[in-house]
Amino acid sequence: MYLSIIILPLLGSIVSGFFGRKVGVTGSRILGCLSIITTTILAIISFFEVGFNNNPISINLFKWLDSESFNMVWNFQFDSLTVSMLIPVLVISSLVHFYSIGYMSHDPHSQRFFSYLSLFTFMMIILVTGNNYLLMFVGWEGVGVCSYLLVSFWFTRIAANQSSLSAFLTNRVGDCFLTIGMFVILWSLGNLDYSTVFSLAPYINENIITIIGICLLIGAMAKSSQVGLHIWLPMAMEGPTPVSALIHAATMVTAGVYLLIRSSPLIEYSSTVLLICLWLGAVTTVFSSLIGLFQQDIKKIIAYSTMSQLGMMVIAIGLSSYNVAIFHLINHAFYKGLLFLGAGAVIHAVVDNQDLRKYGGLISFLPLTYTVILIASLSLVAFPFMTGFFSKDFILESAYGQYHFSSINVYFIATIGAVFTTLYSVKVIYLTFLANPNGSVNYYKNAHEGDIFLSLPLVILAIFSIYFGYLTKDIYIGLGSGFFIDNSIFIHPMREILIDTEFGVPTIFKLLPFFLTIFFSVLSIVYYEYMPKVVVDFNLTNLGYYIYGFFNQRFLVEFFYNKYIVNTVLDLGGQTTKILDKGSVEWIGPYGFGIALVKASKTVSGLGKGVVTDYALYILIGACFYLSIFTFISIFFDLANSITLSCVLVLLGVNNYVKLNKNDNINENSLTSSFLWSNTKEMSKYTTKIII
């Protein structure tokens, strides 16, 4: 069963992509949806089996890398964190597949689209279920490639190609640092397996853990669109709306958050990394929600809303509330997917127009879409008893409940971000459905609700957006919940704040976000309905023009990057190419050698002037040249021969001298021994005579 969860989306992708002509358009849609729906059912079964029974499953397929000091296995694990991530990934994916049947019904390349969607789901499952950092990185790169393919699906659009390239290159920055972090893990621990790395984490130098954590955080910043590496996410809205719902709301953008949660046994031992996460999430929340307030494209507003909620998740990670972070991740996937699919239904109804200012009065034509977008928006602003309320407010309470200077400041900053979230949510609902009609007559003549393929996913996600948070809050954030006792996440005992959050936060600070949400919702509706002239008059002033332009142009971050980073790198690359590739390398190499030969041949050919005396001079010079060469060679060889002969003679003389010395020594030794022997004999005779 567990292996089927991994394999089925890949089979669906292969059939739709390589055999699309054989099975046809309808066949590719049916097979793609069936494979994902079957996988979703199996994932729900695994959620109950693994999560509630605390029975982690491990699957070893085969060895990938095998050396003396480093072994890597294709190993997949299903623990409580994995099955929790599989639920939003596969539920949203199956609903998006079903939704795409109606949304992409008139597209001539729907087989390719369904193949890309199934391949993305497969790569996301690899990322979530991998049992080591290298296998996780395979899925990490896979979802990046699939995102590139899906954003540029309509490749005849220049904006789509630019957006996909921007997403691809921006994520390369994060991937580079993630790779560096993996190298540091391998250098310091000798392994990339989760169990080995996490079991040795308490015994490593904190500075090394900080370096690893910062590298992992930068990788997560790019994938989860945090401030600094966020520019690709709003541009990625050029892709089809189902792609935005699947990739850029529910699954791929949460991969960075998942990476940090999975690495909790590592980063818990570095307070520096946690503090950076805390402030990074706070800045991202306010930054993105403030930009979203000044956007006019409905999909870009929802994209900046996604970025803001990802900042909330990073705040929870900085507070060491990993269970709250994963809970908010799952809740956010459902209501943000609903927002994107609802926006897709609106865009589909008004002939692909995405400008809010050309909507208005659509509540009469799209009552179901209005209802589901209202439900999703209420969940987004954490209205009481909606799904988002149980996780988003708990993050804010956790920030105040830690009782540190940084966390209390982050509480107020994130609350301001929540207020801006309320404002642009009301803006979307009001300008789209409640305001006076501002669009073309053709919009309203042709506006209609979608078919069953567009409507059913909206209803299902609306049910999730209402009830899922209430039904699962005790599983993820309840006191004494044993859902994560299989050590899939780790919270250091010194940083455990669940009880402080539940019982130590004053009631006023628990209710403050709710009161601000209600107050600013009413204020914004009154403002738009009864005082629109004030907004127009302010925008027409110089101050209003500059303020609106600054926020509408996203704090001029893209302008800064293009002017000071992109242009600098391009100039540096151009100069490098000019000096090295086009310069020294080619001058030393074939280009310069060819030019030298051509010039030499022209010089030689220019010597033929037809003057006899010049020719005689050339002959004389040539003869002298050849004579000098031969003379040098003869002298050189004579000198060499003389040296060789002298060396031979010297060696022979030395050899003879050594031999003569040896013979003389031998003769002297023989004479001495004979003389001594004869004297000994005579002495013995004389001694004998005396004795007689």
From Swiss-Prot:
Parts of the chain that traverse the membrane: 5-23, 30-52, 81-103, 112-129, 133-155, 168-190, 200-222, 243-262, 272-294, 301-319, 329-351, 364-386, 409-431, 452-471, 511-528, 535-557, 615-637
Bilayer topology annotation: Multi-pass membrane protein
Protein name: NADH-ubiquinone oxidoreductase chain 5
One Pfam assignment: Proton_antipo_N
Entry EC no(s): 7.1.1.2
Protein task: Core subunit of the mitochondrial membrane respiratory chain NADH dehydrogenase (Complex I) that is believed to belong to the minimal assembly required for catalysis. Complex I functions in the transfer of electrons from NADH to the respiratory chain. The immediate electron acceptor for the enzyme is believed to be ubiquinone.
Gene source species: Hypocrea jecorina
Membership in a protein family: Belongs to the complex I subunit 5 family.
Subcellular location: Mitochondrion inner membrane
Cellular component terms per the entry's GO annotation: mitochondrial inner membrane
